[in-house]
């Protein structure tokens, strides 16, 4: 775990415990394997692991795919907090409704081609889609 800067096992466990609690990861204990967690808790465990390195940029590819609504909202809240704290959040999703809920700026990519950079000031689905079919 030295790759995360930990040489003190006690400090590491404390940090992991704090991240798991903050993300409301439902598990039997810190030694539980990620594969044994529900899909939503697995996603949150991945975020917890990323948080351990204190990144300045979060690259999220479909981070809420196949998770329940509560987990989805928790992930959105976490990423909003990180963005508000000055971190960059790149959020890739094919769910336009979700993008409109969470994004400040939207880069449209259609069939691998960059189409439009939009500032999300109450954009509608219809407005965004109009740029896709120009």
Predicted regions and their residues:
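Glycine-rich phosphate-binding loops of nucleotide-dependent enzymes
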Residues: 1-134
């Amino acid at each position: 775990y030295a790759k995360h800067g930990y040489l003190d096992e006690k400090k590491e466990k404390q940090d992991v415990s704090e991240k798991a609690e903050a993300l409301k990861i439902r598990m039997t204990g810190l030694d539980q394997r990620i594969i044994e967690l529900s899909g939503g808790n697995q996603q949150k465990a991945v975020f917890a692991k990323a948080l351990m390195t204190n990144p300045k940029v979060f690259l999220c590819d479909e981070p809420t795919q196949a998770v329940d609504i509560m987990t989805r909202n928790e992930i959105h809240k976490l990423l909003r907090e990180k963005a508000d704290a000055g971190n960059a959040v790149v959020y890739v999703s094919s769910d336009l409704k979700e993008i409109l809920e969470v994004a400040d700026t939207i880069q449209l990519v259609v069939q691998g081609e960059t189409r439009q950079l939009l500032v999300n000031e109450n954009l509608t689905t219809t407005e965004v889609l109009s740029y896709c079919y120009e």
